[in-house]
């Protein structure tokens, strides 16, 4: 099972990624984790990546693809792997294809932006403990206060509506085109000797268990 998980920020990809990893016994490939591990290990690619990171620059796609290929050679990837948050752009998807990185499925978790804004902007956090609430779905006993300590809850900057909207705008511009990219490739079939992935789209609305069952059904 070699899989790319797509969906907007707040669509619930992280939760479903954990279920998929456990069911199929595959690792989640995070480019952030890979970069940190390569830098820490001092590999040639890691040293090169560190130069860009220290200068505050984006690590080039070619270098990230090099790290991906190294990571996929490790024994835990023998049964497959799950990409979450990569590729983010058409250029990265093209680079993966050119590098011969095989993908069986592209699974999109679809949630309307209005729902994501409500989900994320309604979150409230107790800073000292990390306990989280939601003004609609999981409200505290006393509005605006932690259930245990009674201390005030805050809204993190990341959860503010204007921040959520900006993240969704970036997703719309950069990552959403991948849905068309993989959907079109699935229809065209094999390219450059690389089998086209099957494209699946599921609704991310409902309970966590309902969405999990949809995901598993889509990957049969």
Swiss-Prot record:
AMP binds at residues 31, 36, 57-59, 85-88, 92, 156, 167. One of its GO terms (molecular function) is ATP binding. InterPro entries: Adenyl_kin_sub, Adenylat/UMP-CMP_kin, Adenylat_kinase_CS, Adenylate_kinase_lid-dom, P-loop_NTPase. Keywords: ATP-binding, Cytoplasm, Kinase, Nucleotide biosynthesis, Nucleotide-binding, Transferase. Its EC number is 2.7.4.3. GO terms for biological process: AMP salvage. Residues 30-59 are annotated as: NMP. Pfam families: ADK, ADK_lid. HAMAP family: Adenylate_kinase_Adk (MF_00235). Catalyzes the reversible transfer of the terminal phosphate group between ATP and AMP. Plays an important role in cellular energy homeostasis and in adenine nucleotide metabolism. Monomer. This is Adenylate kinase. It comes from Burkholderia cenocepacia (strain HI2424). The lineage of its organism: Bacteria, Pseudomonadati, Pseudomonadota, Betaproteobacteria, Burkholderiales. The gene is adk.
